[in-house]
Amino acid sequence: MSCYIYQLPSWVLDDLCRNMDTLSEWDWMQFASYVITDLTQLRKIKSMERAQGVSITRELLWWWGMRQATVQQLLDLLCHLELYRAAQIILNWKPVLEVKSSIPDFSDTVKPGKPLAASVRNTEDKQETGQPVRPPTFPGSGPAAVRVNLPAPPEDASSSLKTNQTASADSKDFSASIPKQETLSSLAGDDLFWSEVDVIQATDNFNPSHKISEGTFADVYRGHKRGTPFIFKKLREMACSGPGSVEKFFQAEVQICRRCCHPNVLPLLGCCTGEQFYSLIYPYMANGSLQDRLQGQGGSDPLPWPQRISICSGLLHAVEHLHSLEIIHGNVKSSNVLLDQNFTPKLAHSMAHPCPVNRTSKYTMMKTHLFQASTAYLPEDFIRVGQLTKRVDIFSCGIVLAEVLTGIPAMDNNRNPVYLKDLLLHEIPSSTISLCSRKMGVEKEMAKEICQKYLEKRAGRLPEAHAEALVMAACLCLRRRNASLAEVCSSVAAVEEQLRGQETSLPCSGLSEGTGSSFNTPEETDDVDNSSFDGSYSMRAAPWAGATSSPPLTADEEGMLLAGGAVEADSSAEACAPPEPPQDATETSWKIEINEAKRKLMENILLYKEEKLDSIELFGP
């Protein structure tokens, strides 16, 4: 079966969209009319070309790909419309295995005037009834047909388990010459293995009354051994998964737990490879998940602010530790942040494991359904491209931070919008002050508006400066593609220390580590989309309270002041001390001030060079 359009590599899709965007309006509309039946939707996509940096072909293919259109369908349409240059871009991606003719032969499945969207719906109907699905072909002038058999992309192996060590032995199937029990025992270690009898006794043979929850790949039970409570994760095969998926999941889970030893990562206490089941054993978390506590499950009291921020700090440090080992969690959400008896957070249920290899239509439909359940914590670029990077974990941490700050669940089908991320991303650029101007206090005003609208009231009183700093930290995770997790950790840690009432000497580098803070030099950012907000802490010039001769603060310094309040400078930090006036005329004077009009012009010129302002806004009033 041909692969789907959304499985095309990014470089192939970029070349294809760049080629199709240069077509004449007539040719492009002719191509699009075969794809979309709804003229309103077609005009909506066509109107996006007025937005700078938006490829209307990419939007069109995204719309079509989400309806499970195949690459073969796209290739047949391009050949039918004689757009051979665009078709050749796809053909160059994979070698052509069989070409019977240079002219495509169209069948009666799709005729001119009958758009491809209808054929996609027919395909979905056949999938539901269990009938075999064949990509539609297009009628042509010749009797022969060209069918380019594009092989499916390689198996999505455990790409998230990026390590410098050789993983070839782990990614292969277990050897037939080595017993399975012996292979897994060498992987996990004898000290971790439980006997099948012990697991059955501890869980009362997995009694349904001991079941806590049901997951995608496992059921979770509570059990006891010698009076100590444990959690047992019983792995199970999915109808849509490929052969050996349980073994691969088990193998990857043990790998991750053995490599990670961190106070905020849920430890693996044992595992069992019985004849009838696979099981993983974890410590029992007395206070459940962060999601349950935020939503008051079981009548629990709301978490106070010191506990909330301490939990966020622990989560960020756990993810930072995983990233230092080149491990991507891929499943960061509030329900996977477990709390022990002391409310210490433990990050659990990593999804960094090999995906099933059986790419049938039922598996694809099931995977899409499961994928939509986690969309609330995933960035838009991952949803479109599907490439798992550290950016996915950082974005998910931003959503968890937002849940803690607002008390609003990440997904609510009775709310508009359904996802919390859409609510925040809509509110960020809709602040009363234009966020593209980089004026003084823009981010502070934006954070203040969000706090006034959505800050959790049941957790008690949180100082305004601390709340704004946490909001800006969450926005940093959500809006900046190259966001540094160390910056977010520094901001949250500063607020945590202030709430604890401890007097600490914070570095003057602020939220950013290793970032230059030269005057009138904007921070380089890489935004997720083309909105005006760049999610970075923009350049400001505000005097430090109490320092009469200090230079204007940069974004990093002011961000730390927002996070930690007014903190006196450490005497050992020379960079924080106000510079002495120059003794002669040859020295650079920090007292030179630029008037506001010239400063604004310089900032606007920088924005103009970044193509964030046009000439009218640059020289306008």
From Swiss-Prot:
Residues 113-175, 503-534 are annotated as: Disordered. Residues 157-169, 503-522 have a biased composition (Polar residues). Coiled coil: none annotated. InterPro entries: DEATH-like_dom_sf (IPR011029), Death_dom (IPR000488), Death_IRAK2 (IPR042151), Kinase-like_dom_sf (IPR011009), Prot_kinase_dom (IPR000719). ATP binds at I212, S213, E214, G215, T216, F217, A218, D219, V220, K233, K333, S334, S335, N336. GO terms for cellular component: cytoplasm; nucleus; plasma membrane. GO terms for molecular function: ATP binding; protein kinase activity. Keywords: ATP-binding, Nucleotide-binding. Residues 206-476 form the Protein kinase domain. It comes from the Eukaryota. Transmembrane segments: none annotated. GO terms for biological process: interleukin-1-mediated signaling pathway; intracellular signal transduction; lipopolysaccharide-mediated signaling pathway; positive regulation of canonical NF-kappaB signal transduction; Toll signaling pathway. Residues 13-94 form the Death domain. The protein kinase domain is predicted to be catalytically inactive. Belongs to the protein kinase superfamily. TKL Ser/Thr protein kinase family. Pelle subfamily. PANTHER family: INTERLEUKIN-1 RECEPTOR-ASSOCIATED KINASE, INTERLEUKIN-1 RECEPTOR-ASSOCIATED KINASE-LIKE 2. Interacts with MYD88. IL-1 stimulation leads to the formation of a signaling complex which dissociates from the IL-1 receptor following the binding of PELI1. Binds to the IL-1 type I receptor following IL-1 engagement, triggering intracellular signaling cascades leading to transcriptional up-regulation and mRNA stabilization. This is Interleukin-1 receptor-associated kinase-like 2. It comes from Bos taurus.
